[in-house]
């Protein structure tokens, strides 16, 4: 979760999974890549921003439709701080913007993002 001046970075997903939903930037880990390196790369690819990746903020999972589910994704969200770049949607993001944490609930979010916000409610979000 990239935090800048009290706002969080959201992207609108352009890829097939959760298409059109708003979420924090993220994606798959490449073979041989650390989780933190993957997080920094995904933010750069999807938003054009360079980030310093900090502590683990949240761990969760999400399942696709069907039985068995169409997909099962493990989620590890880190605190991120912008250190460079210029904001702009790229790669599989159709839009990218900073929004106030409380305002994020007004966006069309996947269930995993709603759970993340529920878990953070009332907590001091690190910057």
Predicted features and spans:
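Generic C-terminal helix-cap and adjacent flexible tail
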Residues: 121-127
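NUDIX/MutT-family hydrolases
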Residues: 79, 88-120
């Amino acid at each position: 979760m990239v935090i800048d001046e009290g706002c969080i970075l959201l992207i609108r997903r352009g890829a097939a999974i959760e298409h059109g939903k708003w979420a924090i930037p993220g994606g798959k880990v490449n073979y041989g890549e650390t989780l933190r390196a993957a997080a920094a790369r995904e933010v750069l690819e999807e938003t054009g921003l360079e980030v310093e990746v900090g502590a683990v903020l949240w761990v969760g999972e999400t399942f696709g439709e069907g039985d068995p589910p169409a997909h099962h994704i493990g989620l590890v969200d880190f605190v991120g701080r912008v250190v460079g770049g210029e904001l702009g949607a790229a790669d599989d993001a159709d839009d990218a913007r900073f929004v106030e944490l409380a305002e994020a609930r007004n966006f069309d979010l996947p269930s995993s993002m709603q759970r993340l916000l529920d878990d953070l409610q009332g907590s001091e979000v690190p910057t």
